[in-house]
Amino acid sequence: MTRLIFMGTPQFSATVLQGLLEKPAYDILAVVTQPDRAVGRKKDITMTPVKKLALAHQLPVFQPEKLSGSQELADIMALGADGIVTAAFGQFLPTVLLDSVTFAVNVHASLLPKYRGGAPIHYAIINGDKEAGVTIMEMVKEMDAGDMISSASLPILDTDNVGTMFDKLAILGRDLLLKTLPDYLSGDLKPVPQDHSQATFSPNLSAEEERLDWSKPAREVFNHIRGMNPWPVAHTLLDGQRFKIYEAELAEGSGSAGQIIAKTKKALVVAAGEGALSLTLVQPAGKPKMPIVDFLNGIGRSLEVGDVLGE
């Protein structure tokens, strides 16, 4: 039996952890995840999905604010694990920890060396990529630069957003890890170095990147909206206030960038630099998200063709 420390935070990670827990070949000694955080409009203190799953299986849980130099690090190393598996953990692993185990592998949600960093799925959708994937890789000190053990891909559909792709890639990553790990540990599967000259990066998105640029072609704005849903959510301005847009559809029509070019009781069409978008799920400032029909029957009733979003 291989003794493991698992490190991860969101539901993506919990899906991978669940797969390991169902395999008798692996003994999960402990789980390391991010601290509980205030979440949502009510700022409720919330456990990470990985912590919830770990507690359900009565596993020890460590939640260091910063792993390096912490007492938790010493306690984790004292467990004597054979290896570490990480998936969207959200922190760098200290070299001393990597050196203390026989192996350390990561389930990364991109086709490396493309999209190293913390937001690979967001960037894949925003950039209009036709496919996304996962890579099982060895952990090294440099971010997502380790040798690749295996990879798998799937298509990105127009109906996909970050949330749906996270769910799909979590399952893909779980299955790939469980398929790959035995051959890797036996030495039958040899890792392959990345071509570092081809590396691209996907750093966490800034607040400025959440704002839509209506001067871009409609397809790019459409991709941007999907690449921000369900978090951090793309927005524009409506009467000077933040107006979040969760979902939209490509539409025909033209006009000045951000201009409302059609309005009915059920639709609101906005021009982009080329083409247009019909908004379908929105969130006005201070309100919950709502279908466009509800918005147009309420506070959006006063909008008129010719009004401009983004100002």
Curated annotation (Swiss-Prot):
One of its GO terms (cellular component) is cytosol. The keyword Cell wall biogenesis/degradation does not apply. Signal peptide: none annotated. It holds the Pfam family Formyl_trans_N. Keywords: Protein biosynthesis, Transferase. (6S)-5,6,7,8-tetrahydrofolate binds at residues 110-113. CDD domains: FMT_core_Met-tRNA-FMT_N (cd08646), Met_tRNA_FMT_C (cd08704). GO terms for molecular function: methionyl-tRNA formyltransferase activity. Its EC number is 2.1.2.9. Attaches a formyl group to the free amino group of methionyl-tRNA(fMet). The formyl group appears to play a dual role in the initiator identity of N-formylmethionyl-tRNA by promoting its recognition by IF2 and preventing the misappropriation of this tRNA by the elongation apparatus. Belongs to the Fmt family. This is Methionyl-tRNA formyltransferase. The lineage of its organism: Bacteria, Bacillati, Bacillota, Bacilli, Lactobacillales. The gene is fmt.
